[in-house]
Amino acid sequence: MSIEFTRRSMLQLAAAGMLAPAGAGFAQAYPARSIRLIVPFPPGGSTDLVARLMAQRLGDALKQPVVVENKPGAGSVLGTDFVAKSAPDGYTLVMAANSSIAPGPLMRSSMPYDPIKDFVHIAMVGSFPNGFMVRNDHPARTMQEFLALARARPGSLNYASAGVGTSGFLSGELLKQSAQVDMVHVPYKGSGPAITDLLGGQLDALFEGMVTATGYVRSGKLRLLAVTSERRVKAFPDVPTLTELVPGVSGAAWFGISAPARTPAPITERLQAEVLAVLQSADMQTRLGDLGMTPLPYGSTETLAFIQNEMRKWAPVIKAANVKVD
């Protein structure tokens, strides 16, 4: 076979669309087996709920199961570190969040991974405010009454969060500093155990993402006193924002999907496309909206910029509050 014939044949095949770049073939072959989506919190919390919604729809789109695995610990650091050190082959992903990526690491003296360099941040999923909830038999019927009670009885009231470094934890620290109240923080390894103890009467209050809080409030099991968003939540228009009562106390939790650094670009690009398609579907927009969440269909570049902005935004706040989780 002559060199000229080979070259001519290759050009003809390429023109016919029978040849594709190696990367395209790589992406088409992926995934060949099930994918693990690591949730660095226990079952039952906001991260877990959103992960399971995404896993079901991503699995349908990718034609392979996306299996949620819960790996809690150290305020979401353990599970996230597990993914950072996993094979960069697209088969182990993580639900990235405030506590593990930004601004959580700013509150720690050391981290086992670099939140920027050790991951490919594939896409954002969405954001939502935290809700400040109490059990139904709590004497405080409003946020004003809770703050008044806290001021009258310094150190006697407690509140929980899903763990040190989480958005709920940071909201609580900001509230204590700005409102000048002395409350005891009780950290948990995830939302599920904290909600159980709140319902059981072991806690006074809980900062929890509205994704999880909404169901408990609508069912009448817990009472929502305030939210951390800049504006009132549409689902609960009579519930005030914290910033209405204590100026400057606001913030939102966020979720994204990330892979280990060095995961091949064709794989991360395929995942990005599927995640964004899921988020832009009418079904998912409605489902997340019903949970009090704002979908944020950002690609990898926008997600990285968002994370870097979160670092800049919260760094001075954390420094002023002298927040350290280790």
Region annotations inferred by a language model:
Residues I101-S110, K176-S178, A205-P237:
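A ligand-binding cleft/hinge motif common to bilobed small-molecule-binding domains
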Residues T6, G75, T142, P187-G190, ...:
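Short loop/turn segments at beta->alpha junctions
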Residues F26-K117, S156, V181-D204, P297, ...:
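N-terminal (or domain-start) structured segment
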